[in-house]
Amino acid sequence: MTNIRKTHPLMKIVNNAFIDLPAPSNISSWWNFGSLLGICLILQILTGLFLAMHYTSDTTTAFSSVTHICRDVNYGWIIRYMHANGASMFFICLFMHVGRGLYYGSYTFLETWNIGVILLFAMMATAFMGYVLPWGQMSFWGATVITNLLSAIPYIGTNLVEWIWGGFSVDKATLTRFFAFHFILPFIITALAMVHLLFLHETGSNNPTGIWSDSDKTPFHPYYTIKDILGALLLILALMLLVLFAPDLLGDPDNYAPANPLNTAPHIKPEWYFLFAYAILRSIPNKLGGVLALILSILILVLMPALHTSKQRSMMFRPISQCIFWILVADLLTLTWIGGQPVEHPYIIIGQLASIMYFLLSLVLMPMASTIENNLLKW
């Protein structure tokens, strides 16, 4: 008798994706982050659902409803902090996942990579709108500053901003629509993640060497299911350490003050995972230029396959490219630090230099290093 998992129409899909899937036999722990992102997404949808049961998206009661969740709802505080810090864990996994793709040349799977970039944009939009919902000072001023960037678009900018606001300032209409979008986007992300997996399973996974691995495959279950469970346990451990011991470590104290349109927050800054892009935005004195640099800082990922000049796919055997990659990582950490600092000397010049370095490393030095390595191979 044939096993039900191989005959049942639904079970067959699950079987081919998670059980009998042929996987390369040498993929390292850097390949764990895909499954960890899936776990984060499920966790965020579940905690978000329970928060939405008690949250009210009205400017007069939003802040109070979040306080009510933390004080009066059974285990509301843990649900709230799991959701807030879950977003941080989500982005840590995401940055690791993208970094792995860049290092090992996974961007040569064009469809998978491009869907991944769309997923990144969708996640950034979701996180931004979620940050507005508690209606604290940083929520309000963050929403005002970031939505205002659209006014840099020539001719239609001002109308576009007022259309998004639903009025002449960030107000009740803005909060209500942000809540609606924040609720629907994770389900769109789930659908996109399924398409991401669909395209990945058309080609099969990459591996650390970047070499075609059809001649050496192993079943996904039990080898990689066990490996994924270990990763999941470590993720949950890290998340719960954050939630139970330092829930406000990554948050902003200003967001514990209710939103006040008459009083500007002293240092307007987004959550830590957007600081690198925020630093690039601030480093250009021109508004439109800053917005373009901000968008390009993420869109640069789409250009990666076109900028790949090496004869080898992975960076595993390319020491010059490895050096440039790790300098890029250090540069991104520098930008993250600068994004959280006030706009004054010496932070302004450091931010500008780090922004120039970011684009220089990605667009110029990376392809140059690959070409040099190609020539060294001939010796």
Curated annotation (Swiss-Prot):
Broad class of the protein's primary localization: mitochondrion
Swiss-Prot/TrEMBL cofactor(s): heme b
Note describing how the cofactor binds: Binds 2 heme b groups non-covalently.
GO CC terms: mitochondrial inner membrane; respiratory chain complex III
Domain of life: Eukaryota
Annotated PANTHER family: CYTOCHROME B (PTHR19271:SF16)
Summary of the function given for this chain in its UniProt record: Component of the ubiquinol-cytochrome c reductase complex (complex III or cytochrome b-c1 complex) that is part of the mitochondrial respiratory chain. The b-c1 complex mediates electron transfer from ubiquinol to cytochrome c. Contributes to the generation of a proton gradient across the mitochondrial membrane that is then used for ATP synthesis.
Residues that, per the record, bind heme b b566: 97, 196
Gene3D superfamilies: Cytochrome Bc1 Complex, Chain C
Any Pfam family hit: Cytochrome_B
Binding annotation for heme b b562: 83, 182
GO biological-process terms attached to the record: mitochondrial electron transport, ubiquinol to cytochrome c
Assembly information from the UniProt record: The cytochrome bc1 complex contains 11 subunits: 3 respiratory subunits (MT-CYB, CYC1 and UQCRFS1), 2 core proteins (UQCRC1 and UQCRC2) and 6 low-molecular weight proteins (UQCRH/QCR6, UQCRB/QCR7, UQCRQ/QCR8, UQCR10/QCR9, UQCR11/QCR10 and a cleavage product of UQCRFS1). This cytochrome bc1 complex then forms a dimer.
Keywords: Electron transport, Heme, Iron, Membrane, Metal-binding, Mitochondrion, Mitochondrion inner membrane, Respiratory chain, Transmembrane, Transmembrane helix, Transport, Ubiquinone
Membrane topology: Multi-pass membrane protein
SUPFAM superfamilies: a domain/subunit of cytochrome bc1 complex (Ubiquinol-cytochrome c reductase), Transmembrane di-heme cytochromes
Note: Heme 1 (or BL or b562) is low-potential and absorbs at about 562 nm, and heme 2 (or BH or b566) is high-potential and absorbs at about 566 nm.
Ranges annotated as spanning the membrane: 33-53, 77-98, 113-133, 178-198, 226-246, 288-308, 320-340, 347-367
A single MF term (Gene Ontology): ubiquinol-cytochrome-c reductase activity
Subcellular location: Mitochondrion inner membrane
Residues at which a ubiquinone binds: 201
Name the UniProt record assigns to this protein: Cytochrome b
Family: Belongs to the cytochrome b family.
